[in-house]
């Protein structure tokens, strides 16, 4: 750092001058002047003693103005923690001002002036002060403690060749004189700085701690926001999944209903010649692209007449499923005696139960042929089967199966044939027509009539039917047919001989008069009320025909009929009218089956599935 060619006489002259002046301590300007004198390489070659003295005087005069700038340079150098602050200040000042003369070639005749040197010193001092302030303001302790040492260690290592002379000079100066007050103050400041730890100040540490806390809080908030967004997305996905499942179920249900409706339209028997022709828009499902996801089969496009022959049967439950209103009991009390069977359900009750009655027009379209020459009634109900949805009301007698039986009467060679061909898909009425003719001149006695009734009872008991007792067969005779006619005006004739077993609506000839061979055929014509006897209407030609018919349509028609045809006179008619009492049937029921005695029992009987057996 220092020039090795500097003669020792110059150093000695300064020291001796200082010693001869009576212990005068050199000031900072004097030190700078000596440094400038030492850094001049051409001092021994081209300058004379006078020029050197003049230069020294000019330096001394001008260095006073630079002392203020040189002093902080010394102070800044002491912040770096070197063991010898004064020698290092001289080192640093010399290094800052001796760069250009040493870098310049030795043959140059021009030397830097004192003003240039002072300006350079001031600039370097300002730079160092700014750098020191920046380093102190940083929060990183490692950078603040290592960077100054690295910089100044590089400078010191670059000038290791001149360190020995500087140490000798500093040692001679310390041995000769003590430092002045300024040097003592600067050394005190340096010692205080050295006593402080190399880490951060408390304020910096507090600031750094608060910054870390803020960073932690910000990071926590960021993580919480991300977690909240993730949870919201998860919840939204769950809601969408649930909605997707619900919508799929709704689409599946609607598609199933649509297919059912399309099938219903296809199965409908259209009256037009071309049949039922559905448009292509109805045949193609709106949810065609979702059928694969919904696991539904695609709807096959069939012909317009493909479903005409499809008939859907709908089973009818028992009468216990029908709900009657609050006034039903009173209405039944007015129509029927206690313990008797129920009337037919009304149209409202049918609609409430979800079933439809067959239209009267369809009933009239079904032809029936009646042969007047014989006693055979042929029921043709299979001519035009209806392709529409049918609701055949079947009474609670599902187990009743049998065939049409021919019951021989007590007269000569006369058969009471009852042919019933009922179909559950076509009609809910079985035409049970009973006609009885008397070709003999002998009179019919009540004993013969009662024997015929007993024969019918025995046939019912012996047949495969749920009516296993005579009492059940007797009640079966009073049950209406499957059309449920209103039996309000049906009468039960009391036996004039006191026979309680006569529970049929039969008319007995008691005057022994000769009967005619006139056969009065009563055609049902889909009306089950024709086989009941109404005394409020006029009689035709003195001939009265009564019949009791029971029909059950469960695929196989079963019919039982007993008829008596006798002429009457006015006295007998009056006797018959006066003899029809509503309490006779109740009295007979009390005698034979005493469990049906009041309205509550009849209601319980109705709720029990209307099964009489």
UniProtKB/Swiss-Prot annotation:
Gene3D superfamilies: 1.20.5.170. Residues 178-191 have a biased composition (Acidic residues). One of its GO terms (molecular function) is DNA-binding transcription factor activity, RNA polymerase II-specific. Interacts with Jra/jun; the interaction enhances the DNA-binding activity of Atf3. Pfam families: bZIP_1. Residues 233-261 are annotated as: Leucine-zipper. Disruption phenotype: Mutants die soon after hatching and during all three larval stages with only 2% reaching the third instar larval stage and these die before metamorphosis. Altered expression levels of a number of genes in third instar larvae and chronic inflammation and starvation responses in the larval gut epithelium with a predominance of extremely large lipid droplets and obesity but not hyperglycemia. Its main location: nucleus. Residues 138-147, 369-389 have a biased composition (Polar residues). Transmembrane segments: none annotated. GO terms for cellular component: nucleus. Moderate expression in some regions of the larval nervous system, the ring gland and imaginal disks. High expression in larval gut, excretory malpighian tubules, salivary glands, and, to a lesser extent, the fat body where levels are approximately 2.5-fold less than the gut. Residues 207-229 are annotated as: Basic motif. Keywords: DNA-binding, Nucleus, Transcription, Transcription regulation. It comes from the Eukaryota. Residues 205-268 form the bZIP domain. One of its GO terms (biological process) is regulation of transcription by RNA polymerase II. The keyword Heme does not apply. Transcription factor which binds to the cAMP response element (CRE). Regulates metabolic and innate immune homeostasis, possibly by controlling appropriate expression of genes involved in peritrophic matrix composition and ensuring the normal digestive and immune function of the gut. Required for the expression of odorant receptors Or43b and Or47b. This is Activating transcription factor 3. Belongs to the bZIP family. ATF subfamily.
């Amino acid at each position: 750092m220092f020039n090795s060619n500097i003669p020792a006489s110059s150093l000695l002259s300064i020291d001796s001058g200082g010693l001869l002046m009576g212990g005068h301590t050199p000031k900072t300007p004097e030190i700078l002047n000596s440094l400038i004198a030492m850094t001049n390489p051409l001092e021994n070659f081209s300058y004379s003693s006078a020029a050197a003295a003049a230069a020294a005087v000019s330096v001394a005069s001008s260095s006073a103005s630079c002392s203020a700038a040189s002093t902080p340079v010394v102070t800044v150098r002491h912040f770096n923690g070197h063991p010898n602050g004064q020698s290092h200040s001289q080192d640093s000042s010399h290094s800052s001002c001796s760069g250009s003369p040493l870098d310049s070639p030795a043959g140059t005749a021009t030397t830097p002036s004192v003003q240039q040197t002072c300006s350079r010193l001031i600039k370097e001092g300002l730079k160092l002060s700014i750098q020191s302030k920046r380093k102190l303001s940083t929060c990183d302790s490692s950078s603040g403690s290592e960077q100054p040492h690295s910089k100044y260690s590089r400078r010191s290592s670059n000038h290791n060749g001149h360190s020995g002379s500087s140490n000798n000079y500093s040692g001679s100066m310390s041995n000769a004189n003590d430092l002045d007050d300024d040097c003592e103050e600067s050394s005190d400041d340096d010692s205080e700085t050295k006593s402080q730890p190399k880490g951060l100040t408390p304020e910096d540490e507090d600031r750094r701690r608060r910054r870390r806390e803020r960073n932690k809080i910000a990071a926590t908030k960021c993580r919480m926001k991300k977690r909240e967004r993730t949870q919201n997305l998860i919840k939204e996905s769950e809601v969408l999944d649930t909605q997707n499942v619900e919508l799929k179920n709704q689409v599946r249900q609607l598609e199933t209903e649509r297919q059912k409706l399309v099938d219903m339209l296809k199965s409908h028997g259209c009256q037009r010649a071309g049949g039922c022709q559905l448009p292509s828009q109805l045949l193609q499902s709106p949810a065609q692209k979702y059928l694969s996801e919904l696991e539904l089969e695609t709807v096959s496009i069939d012909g317009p007449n493909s479903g005409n022959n499809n008939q859907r049967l709908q089973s009818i439950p028992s009468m216990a499923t029908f709900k009657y209103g609050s006034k039903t009991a009173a209405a039944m009390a007015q129509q029927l005696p206690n313990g008797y069977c129920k009337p037919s359900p009304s149209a409202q009750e049918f609609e409430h139960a979800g079933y439809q009655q067959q239209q009267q027009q369809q009933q009239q379209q079904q032809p029936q042929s009646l042969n007047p020459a014989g006693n055979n009634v042929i029921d043709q109900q299979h001519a035009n089967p209806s392709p529409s949805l049918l609701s055949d009301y079947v009474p609670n007698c599902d187990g009743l199966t049998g065939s049409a039986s021919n019951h021989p009467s007590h007269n000569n060679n006369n058969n009471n044939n009852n042919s019933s061909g009922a179909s559950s898909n076509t009609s809910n009425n079985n035409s049970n027509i009973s006609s009885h003719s008397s070709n003999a001149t002998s009179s019919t006695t009540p004993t013969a009539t009662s024997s015929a009734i007993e024969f019918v009872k025995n046939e019912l008991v012996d047949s495969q039917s749920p009516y296993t007792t005579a009492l059940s067969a007797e009640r079966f005779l009073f049950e209406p047919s499957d059309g449920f006619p209103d039996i309000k005006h049906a009468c039960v004739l009391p036996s004039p001989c006191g026979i309680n077993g006569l529970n049929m609506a039969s008319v007995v000839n008691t005057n022994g008069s000769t009967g005619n061979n006139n056969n009065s055929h009563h055609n049902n014509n889909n009306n089950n009320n024709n086989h009941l006897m109404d005394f409020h209407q006029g009689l035709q030609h003195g001939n009265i025909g009564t019949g009791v018919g029971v029909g059950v349509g469960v695929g196989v028609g079963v019919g039982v009929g007993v008829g008596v045809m006798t002429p009457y006179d006015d006295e007998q008619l009056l006797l018959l009218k006066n003899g029809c009492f509503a309490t006779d049937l109740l009295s007979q029921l009390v005698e034979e089956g005493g469990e049906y005695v009041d309205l509550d029992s009849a209601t319980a009987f109705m709720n029990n599935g209307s099964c009489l057996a």
